[in-house]
UniProtKB/Swiss-Prot annotation:
One of its GO terms (biological process) is nuclear-transcribed mRNA catabolic process, nonsense-mediated decay. This is Proline-rich nuclear receptor coactivator 2 A. InterPro entries: PNRC-like_rgn (IPR028322), PNRC1/2 (IPR026780). Residues 13-23 have a biased composition (Polar residues).
Amino acid sequence: MGGGERFNIPGQHRNNLGKQINRQKLFDRNNQKMNTSHTKDRGRGCGTSLAWQAMQNGINNNAFSPNQNWSAGFPASKNLFTDEDNQNYAGAKFSEPPSPSVLPKPPSHWVLLSCSPAEKELMSFQLKTLLKVQA
């Protein structure tokens, strides 16, 4: 058993659903054919739009003239970054090496307990060398 959930859809609803989908497809096809035939009958496809009429009549819209001074609407570029240049960036500085206190320490299960202090010093030096970023 265990076939999962099943929806009980009576047979009549399935047939009606298929008929509705077929009707919608037929309507969409007929509607597309009617729309294309209307544009062919008019001759010019976009001849009745307001923009087309305005272009034909030679109406000039001064809101978008080509000689408009666009830089007047924007602040001067020299004033954009002057205040930010004087502030210090709080993030990491990659030109300076990190301090040893912020370097990660190896997990305790990596280090044997029988290591001498000299061996621990050597391992920490090797770890710092591996983590050093070369400029």
